[in-house]
Regions:
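Periplasmic c-type cytochrome electron-transfer domains
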Residues: 9-16, 21-479
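N-terminal Lys/Arg-rich, disordered targeting/topogenic segments
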Residues: 1-8
Length: 479
């Protein structure tokens, strides 16, 4: 009897241990890993601007830490306005900036989606509320400065549980469990992750290295170092964020500035993976939705009056000077590669991408089940369609020419230093204000003499008479 009683007690104890372990596992899953879907969006534009792409679990920052960082570390913010100082766009009444997603993965987290770089902003005058254009290039978004901000905050001694919880308490009353979780798990883990990210991005902070600045990143080096896991080299591939509206006009044409990727779905997927998304079945469906949305999203209409007669004259000039590369038609070079020897623009972005990078990236994409067409190494830049060209300033692949009028000038007469990132539009020159006093105060000083910033090349139309240039610019405003 005694032996049987001992055995029964042992079994009961084992069952209790299993129950307790299961309960603990459930609590741990619920508190840190459960995923709740976002509330449904009322529009496709809203889904594009704020919808999750699945980056919160691996790259998200806890919502309340995200909220308090600019208040805790104002000296690390480059200007007034909190996160707005980094050029992110914030719609009136919205909880987060455009391109920032909020999703519960155990607890509310904030991550990014494509809209953080691909939503344009413009004002027709300084006192006007900005107009936001989904899928346009955010020429003001200083992603590099934002990365540096998070890293600098994490390295600050005040990034600790006591100080952060005290700041959170000013805006939110956390439960006792959440306080414990933040104190002993979440805050230490976030600090560690941000410092690790700082180390991963140390290559962009080398002495004398050119800054990305607003509206740019170094896309192919990011692919080499993070997706392909290749060693850091000495290339500079800084490039402008492109417009991604109306993607159906690019069907069958190479993508990226250098034509290194064959399909729009591949470009969208690679970019989303770079933001920390995980290649789940849900993610693949979301990328399909995104591709469909962007395929049919029209380019924005020019917001200023247009001289119809002058634009009609300019259409003829365009047909003679530009259409062979930038308009569809028999024998058109639209969407094809223009060799660097012909186009003559800065080749640093081109040289940053290598055959080794393409091969390694293709292997990784295949392993992840998201290889929608092999990446390649090329030797030139793509002749792109010009729909909505008025809102794509500054111009060339590296954003080295401030406006279309300057692009029609010989290299020696193009602006050498200007200020980018200011969103008041300059209709006369077809671009943004880059030399006014407000532009100088708010903008980033761009010097074409820095490595990768060259404004040479693309000499088409530079020899046109002044009247034909004016007519051509009037027509380009209508595209």
């Amino acid at each position: 009897m005694g032996g049987r009683g001992w055995w029964k007690r042992l079994r009961r104890g084992a069952v209790m241990l299993v129950v307790v372990a299961a309960g603990g596992a459930y609590v741990g899953w619920y508190a840190f890993f459960r995923e709740e879907p976002q509330p449904p969006f009322t529009s496709a534009d809203g889904r594009f601007k704020y919808g999750s792409i699945g980056a919160e679990s691996s790259s998200g920052i806890p919502y309340w830490i995200f909220v308090v960082l600019p208040r805790m570390f104002p000296e690390h913010v480059p200007g007034p306005g909190g996160y707005r100082a980094f050029g992110v766009l914030w719609e009136e009444g919205e909880e987060l900036p455009i391109g920032f997603t909020k999703k519960v993965v155990g607890f509310p987290r904030v991550a990014n989606n494509c809209a953080v770089c691909h939503t344009a902003s413009y004002r027709t005058r300084e006192e006007e509320t900005p107009t936001y254009v989904p899928a346009g290039p955010n020429h003001a978004s200083n992603v590099q400065a934002l990365l540096r901000f998070f890293a600098t905050c994490a390295a600050d001694p005040r990034f600790n549980a006591d100080d952060i919880l005290a700041e959170i308490a000013l805006v939110e009353r956390l439960s006792w469990f959440d306080k414990l979780a933040y104190r002993y798990l979440i805050i230490p883990r976030v600090k560690q992750a941000l410092l690790h990210r700082r180390d991963q991005f140390a290559w962009m902070d080398r002495p004398g290295w050119p800054h990305w600045g607003p509206g740019r990143d170094d896309p192919m080096n990011l692919t080499k170092y993070f997706m392909a896991n290749l060693p850091v080299d000495d290339t500079v591939g800084n490039a402008d964020f492109p417009a991604i509206w109306n993607l159906k006009v690019r069907d069958g044409k190479a993508l990226q500035w250098d034509g290194s990727t064959p399909l729009t779905l591949a470009v969208l997927t690679d970019s989303a993976l770079g933001l920390g998304a995980q290649p789940t079945d849900w993610f693949k469906r979301e990328m399909k939705w995104l591709e469909g949305y962007l395929r049919n999203l029209p380019a924005p209409t020019y917001p200023f009056p247009v001289d119809a007669a002058l634009a009609d004259t300019g259409k003829g000039v365009f047909g003679q000077a530009c259409a062979s590369c930038h308009a569809p038609g028999p024998g058109s070079r639209l969407g094809t590669l223009i060799d660097i020897a012909e186009i003559g623009t800065d080749r640093n972005r081109l040289d940053a991408w290598t055959e080794a990078g393409a091969n390694a990236a293709n292997r990784v994409r295949t392993e992840l089940g998201v290889n929608y067409g092999n990446m390649t190494k090329t030797n030139g830049y793509i002749a792109v369609p010009l729909d909505g060209i008025w809102l794509r300033a500054p111009y060339l692949h590296n954003g080295s020419v401030p406006n279309l009028r300057a692009l029609l000038e010989p290299v020696e007469r193009r602006t050498k230093v200007f200020y980018r990132g200011y969103d008041v539009y300059d209709p006369r020159n077809v671009g943004f204000e880059t030399q006014s006093e407000p532009a100088r105060r708010a903008g980033f000083r761009f010097d074409v003499g820095e490595r990768g910033n060259g404004n040479q090349g693309h000499l088409y139309g530079t020899d046109l008479p002044a009247g034909q240039k004016d007519a051509l610019l009037e027509y380009l405003r209508t595209l």
